[in-house]
Amino acid sequence: MTDLAMTVVVAAPQKIMPSLSALAAYLDEVGTTIVSRDKCPVPTTLQHRRSCELWRISATKGELSRSRLAAIGNELKIDINLQSSEQRLRDYRLAVFDMDSTLIECEVIDLLAERAGVGERVATITERAMRGEIDFDQSFKERLGLLKGLSSDVLDELLNNLPFVEGGSELMLSLRSLGIKTVIVSGGFDVFASHVASVLGMDGYLANTLAIADGRLTGEAVMPIVNANTKREQLLTLAHELGVTAEQSIAVGDGANDLAMLGAAGLGVAFHAKPVVRAQADYQVSHTGLDSLLYFLGHRGELAQ
């Protein structure tokens, strides 16, 4: 039996919400009563390309399937998530984010590889690592080794042209106004994490050190590597330092090395994630921007504009 007080959060990447008859039909199929259907406010800066609805439901006779809801959403190219009242009303105090392909629309190590002339080789390894097909630490060392000798001059060029994910600035502004601490914990590089955290107004970052000597990348990994276990442990450490429980944390990521972190958080969100991550995460955002996380914080009042 499904929780008697739940919310279906629907977010679309356009101003006009498409027909949700397929969603209504599925809810009816499992004996769900739709108590209310309301529009959810979206950030002013995104009003021309975002819409959100909250369907409050109760008295579900059958078991609601998150994967079925996600599949309906994928057909409509929108995001549909099921949230319990307890999670919706929880006092979140910490939000931890992956960086590459989560806060920025690229994998930095792949961009560096392109400049080094080994783009295809590194991109293939990156994709396999993010799908969880190969060990992250070994793949990181292998990819980094291929960058040996690359001039550090390319760093400023890349830093000045990083493509930020839509909704990121709106999300951070609102989280900051709510007093939620925001931190990057990335398997990428510190020089980029520092820049991204600064641009978005985040509270801190942890990432791998990019070793440089005589103006060139050394190709050597600086230990310890920020991997899946590091991400999980850092989330737990940050929560402890804030004096809150892990359940009061939000975690967001896209790759297999984010799964442990997502599982440790009270609200783990697979963001435009690889299939292995979507299959294991309770929440997934695949069609809209980072602002969609705000629609899971329903008790917090108006969004910061």
Question: Which residues fall in each region the model found?
Answer:
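Non-catalytic pre-domain segments flanking phosphatase-related domains
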Residues: M1-F97
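Active-site phosphate-binding/coordination module
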Residues: Q87, L94, A113-R115, D203
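Residue-level recognition of short loop/turn positions
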Residues: M99-D100, R131, D214
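A metal-dependent, Asp-based hydrolase signature
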Residues: V108-S174
